Amino acid sequence: MNNRFLFLSISAIMLLTGNVCSAQVTGTIVNKEKQPVGDAFVTLTCKGKPAKSISTSNKKGIFSVETKMLEGQDCILEIKHAAYAPYLLSLQKIPKAIELDTIRLEENVLEEVTVKADRFINKVDRKLLFPSQDDIKRSNSGYDLIDKVNLPSIYVDMANKKVEKRGSGSVPIFINEKRASQADVVALRPDEVVRIEYIDNPGVEFGLETHAAVINIVVKPRMNGMSIGFNLNDAVTTMNGKNYIYAQYNHRLSKWGIYYQNDFSKLSRRHIDQTDTYTLADGNLHEIRREGINTKLAYANHDFGITYDLTKKGQYSFITQVSSHFYNSPNRGHRQRIFETGKPTYYALTEPTEHYFSPIIDLFFRRYFKKNRTLTFNLVGTMYDTKYGYSFKTFDNEDFDLPTSQYGYDTDGKRYSLIGDIKYSQPLGKSNWTSGISHLQGYTKNKYTGTSDIINEMHNSSTYLYSQISGRFSQLRYMLGIGGSYQYYSQGTESYYYFLLRPSLSLSYPILGKGNIRYVFNISPNAPSLANLSNNRQQSNEYEYHVGNPNLKSYSRYTQTLTLSYEHKYFYIENTTGYMYSQKPILEEITRNGKTNGKTWFDFGYEQQKSAADFWNYTNVQFYVIPNVLTLDGGFSYLLSRYVGNNYTHNFHRLWGYVGTKLFLGKWNFRASWSAKERNFNGESENTTGQNIEAQVNYKLTQDLSIGLYGSHLFLKNGSTFGEATHSQFVKKDLTVYIPEWGNMISLNLTWNLSRGRKYQSEQKGVWNRDNETGIFRGK
């Protein structure tokens, strides 16, 4: 009986102990030498829970944090120690017990970290976001995850696999601080994502190019295993699609990868309406009205790449990628019926064609040193082999058989470039210092045959040095950087060089508890493109010539922004006011010329104008009607622009907005949005993109397989529309491109991902260099 009582007592104690111990997060903390770290301060902060669970690691580095009453919550685990950098870990839907893998801390403190149980952690140049477990489960790719987490002002074009900051332009995607291709983002497994960094204030380390924003996805790739998958997005209403296939294999320190992607379109209904009004030398108006006739459109892109990655955690990382890009556009012309002053009705055929091949090799190496110091090397070689042609023909009849006049030219272009980059980073107390140097060497040779038979040979080089420091004083976060560049360009016997500076200052301060205010000032240099610098002159039609200008000089753009943001459990609001000013910008200029016989023609080119200024205000609001289930968002902007040229002044006003909603119900995802017509002005030209109504529904059949439907330009008779208008004192133009086959376009999306293998915490960080210049002069 005593033995039975003893057995029952021991069993009860064991059960009680098990129940007590199960409500906790446990783990072991070590340093880079794998030695245990004692006296580390561990906190667990959960959404909707004001109190924090607190613990301290023992001499063996072991800690345990009580999670009683926190089951099912989304939390952030923070580890602090005076001798090490802070460590953050997102924990979603906490079960009763979690036993974490060994956690390794890096030496030295980079910056004091404020951990909040909110969607965002604000930094001086970025917002940190930890995707919830629901976000991860609902997502099929990197693009899908970016869309699900609702970054402020960010729009994800799921059909074309593009990310934009609404009203500001495209947003490049980085994975572990290395620029990612579309295929890389498609192949990204959402369950490998540690956090998303929304860099809405890119610093000088991103080079001379000024990005509206940058998104960096921090992932923990697989150490052993494989992944294979595809993402197919093809229209069922017309010939249009974008498809990706990829495979990766990991073994110990190595990873091999291969991918293929294509996008294509083949349409039979596309037309361009255009009205041109010329003020001739004698003061008379001459009008040419072009009525569009449906014409075929066809193009195809093909990308293929292989990747090898050799990484030894904490010591080095070597990545090499070889890729090729093929583009072919055999049918890109348009037919028109012409009504011209003083002439009978006639017809015209405009035919631009383009084919190019571009191989790229990208070598990346990163070395890790003690005290959290890193040194990065990147070398990218690019080649473009381009065949471009432009032809404009007129005809007496609708058969388009015997041309009565024709203008045009053909181009055989070659472009070679090599970009090298070195970047060094190390902590300085509670600040972080980053410096680097980048050099580009390029050679371009374009042979033109047509109106003028010429050969353009251009050499260009660019050397860019930068240094940046970021940190904080009490609650004030700061980032101060400066970049300097030496640019060289030569063409024929002429050569030019100039120096560019890019200083940048950012100040950020928390207000009203969960609010933040940020001021940004920067000077961004702008260099002329190789195409505009070309010493070239080509005739487009009877009245128009397009000319290059090798005398163009760089100019600087001064920008100031003030951003206020506030986050609440049920909403997020952000307002940005900005002002931008440019002295002697490169803008369009149209010159009228005439002969004694009364013949008038117009040169379209670029010149240094007097000034350009933009003032804008943009407000973005997100309502979490049912958190993690139903979200409503919208944005509204106002833009005022003023361009002062050598012989013109233009004032431009624009109002723009959008509304959208996202709904998540179990395995179902729904998304719908409306965006207004977008208008932009530059120099003497206005560009418009028509309104868009889109909707998407997805169903997750299994964890690895999902199917969906995507509709774009819904309920719009003319489908996708694009417009251009010229407001010169000599030439008035109004052009609209109609693509009705893209109206009510329904696409079927099928995504499959299969992966096997365990994971590890990634340490890859890097840079991105790519040359997209061809220097080719393109007709309109």
Walk through the language-model features, giving the residues of each.
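Short, acidic, small-residue-rich periplasmic hinge/interaction motif at the N-terminus
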Residues: 43-45, 78-84, 97-135, 144, ...
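Short, acidic Ser/Thr/Gly-rich low-complexity loop/linker segments typical of extracellular
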Residues: 48-62
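N-terminal periplasmic accessory domains that precede
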Residues: 99-104, 112, 116, 142-145, ...
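Extracytoplasmic beta-strand/coil segments of soluble accessory domains associated
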Residues: 143-178
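Short acidic/polar hinge/loop motifs at secondary-structure boundaries
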Residues: 176-205, 245
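Outer-membrane beta-barrel translocator/receptor signature
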Residues: 208-215, 223-273, 298-301
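Face-selective signature of the C-terminal outer-membrane beta-barrel domain
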Residues: 254-255, 301-327, 350-494, 500-503, ...
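Outer-membrane beta-barrel signature, preferentially recognizing the C-terminal barrel domain
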Residues: 515, 525-575, 581, 602-615, ...
